[in-house]
Amino acid sequence: MIELSSAQPTEPISLHWILPPSKSLMARRLVLSALRGEELPSLEALSLEDTPEDIRSLLQALQKSREGSAVINVGESGTAMRFMTAYLSVAASIPCRLEGTARQHDRPIAPLVDALRSLGADIQYIGKEGYPPLYITPRTLHSTEVSLDVSLSSQYLSALFLLAPRLGERVDIRLSSPLASSPYAYMTSSVVSEAGYQWQEVSEGHFVYEPCSDVAHAADHSLLLAEADWSAASYAYALVALLPLGTECYLPQLVLPSLQGDSRYLPLYMERLGVYTEISEEKIRIYRGEQRGGDCFEADMSPCPDLVPALVAALVGCGVAFRLRGIGHLRVKESDRLEVLGSEFAKLGVSLGIGQDELYWEGDLGEPRVLLSPPIIDPHQDHRIAMALALMTQRVGRLRIQAPDVVAKSFPSYWTQLGKLFTIKPL
C-alpha cells in the first residue's frame, strides 16, 4: 500500500511527464512480426521501466511458443490472451495450453474461438465453456466466411486481422453486432496495411481479405518505442484539469495525428474541462485554461472506453455532472469497472449512478465530510482504477492505494510521474 498526499497548490505549475510507449501499437506490431516469422526483439532491447507489463507478457508468450513450450501463461493480460489465441491456432510449434490468472479465466473468449473454429482452428475449452484456459492444436486455416460477435471486444476482430500473413485465400468477416471500441480495430487494419496486407471494408461490418504477394519489408523494431500511449496520457490530462489555471504539462513522444483511437477523443473531451492541447515537434504541451463545459457532460464512450476512469476522475474533481454511455463492456475488463468506480468513489463521498451500459453523476458532492483518516482505495487488480483514483488526492489531500504495483500493466513509471506533484510513501 502507498499513501499519497498533496499540498494542493493554488498557483500554476509546470510538469514534464514521461509516458510509456503505445501498448496497443506495440502489441499489434509484435504479433504481426511473429506471424511473419521475423525475429522478435528481446526484453532487454525494450526499456523495462517504461514497457507495459502487458507487452512483456505478450512478448514472453510469443518467445515461449517459439521455444516449443506446452504451457503458455499470459497472466493478467487480456490483450495477450486474445492475440495469442489467434497466433497459436496457426503458429504454435506443438499443441499447447493457453492460460492466465483467475480473473482472466472469467473473461469471455467464445466469439473469437467460434470465428477461428469456422476457419479450421482446433481449439478446445479446458474448463468452463466459452472461457480460458484453452487447449490449442495448430492448423492451417482455410478460406471461409466468418460471423463475429464484437459487442464485448474489438480485439476479437483485431486478432483475426493480424492473421493476414497466414491466410492463403480470401476470407470474409461479417460482424453480427455493433463494434465496441471500433478505433482499435481500424488501428489494427492500418498496422497490417503498413506491412502490405489489405483488409477492405466493402460495406458496414463486412471485411474482406484478399492475399497478395507484394508485401512490405521486415518490421522495424524501432517503431515499437516510437510513439507514446494516448490512453496513458489521459491521466496527465485529468490531473491538469484539477490544477490551477495556467498549469502546463509537457508530454514527449505523444503524436498527433496518430493511429491510436484515443487521440481523436481525449483532447476534445478534456478541452471542455479547460485542458488545451498544443502540438509541436515530437511532443505535446497541455495547459489549463477556462472550462468550456455546460451543465452536464454527455458522451458515447464506446469508441474510447479506456478513457472512462481518468475522465470520471476529472469530471468529479471539477464538479461537472456527467452521463457516459456505451460502456457496458467495461464490466468484463480487469475488473467490473462500472461497479468498482462506483464503490471506490463512494469512499470519497461521491455517489455515481450505474446502469447496464452507462455511468452518471448529478454533480452533487453532498455535505462536506471531515476525513479523520485517508480513504483506502482498492483497485481490484485494475491498473486504470488505481491510476484514476490516485488523481483524487488533489481534491481530498491524502489518499491510500492498495496494490500499487498493478499500474505496471500499462504505465510502469506512473508513480514516478505522479511523484513530481504528490508526496508518495510506501506503508
Q: What residues fall within each predicted segment?
A:
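Short, structured segments at the rim of ligand-binding sites
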Residues: 1-427
